């Protein structure tokens, strides 16, 4: 299994992975609309020269207070082809891509997802760090991971995703 940054020639396969994983086109459309925006990151899992997984990060904003300006990214989507799920591919994508986020100066990552799954990587309820989601979601499914200890100390407010998220919902 190889994890690497996406390449131009991967775009059709990435689209297919997202459609297969989510059984709809919304996530694939979202990725296409966000691709190329500053501070987006996209990685693929490749096995035998086939893309079997994909993870994408895009910038979010904090409408509130923070002692300093921070780069915060939103993890969405994470997709693995159904026949490759439950083999650790999503785990590998998350672990390696979070390292890349840190290398690029990102201080925290937010995600909307399963607490049972994402807590394995250190994600906690964003509410514990004074953050809430702009969408009406349960507190426990909106999570955050500080990539630098204490990065969110003194921060509070509403995390806002890019407009493309609403357009593709």
Per-region residue spans from a language model:
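Short amphipathic alpha-helix that is part of the acyltransferase structural core
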Residues: 1-30, 37-52, 70-72, 149-150, ...
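Conserved glycine-rich acetyl-CoA-binding loop
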Residues: 50, 81-92, 104, 120-121
């Amino acid at each position: 299994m190889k994890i690497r940054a996406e390449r131009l020639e991967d775009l059709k396969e990435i689209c297919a992975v997202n459609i297969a994983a989510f059984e709809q086109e919304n996530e694939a459309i979202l990725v296409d609309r966000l691709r190329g925006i500053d501070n987006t990151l996209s990685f693929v899992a490749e096995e035998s020269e086939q893309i079997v997984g994909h993870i994408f990060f895009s910038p979010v904003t904090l409408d509130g207070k923070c002692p300093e300006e921070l780069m915060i990214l939103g993890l969405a989507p994470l997709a693995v082809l159904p026949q490759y799920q439950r083999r650790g591919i999503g785990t590998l994508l998350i672990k390696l891509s979070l390292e890349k986020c840190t290398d690029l100066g990102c201080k925290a990552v937010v995600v909307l997802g399963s607490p049972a799954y994402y807590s394995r990587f250190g994600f906690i309820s964003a509410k514990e760090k004074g953050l809430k989601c702009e969408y009406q979601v349960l507190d426990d499914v909106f999570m955050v991971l500080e990539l630098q200890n204490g990065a969110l100390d003194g921060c509070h407010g509403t995390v806002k995703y890019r407009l493309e998220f609403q357009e593709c919902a």
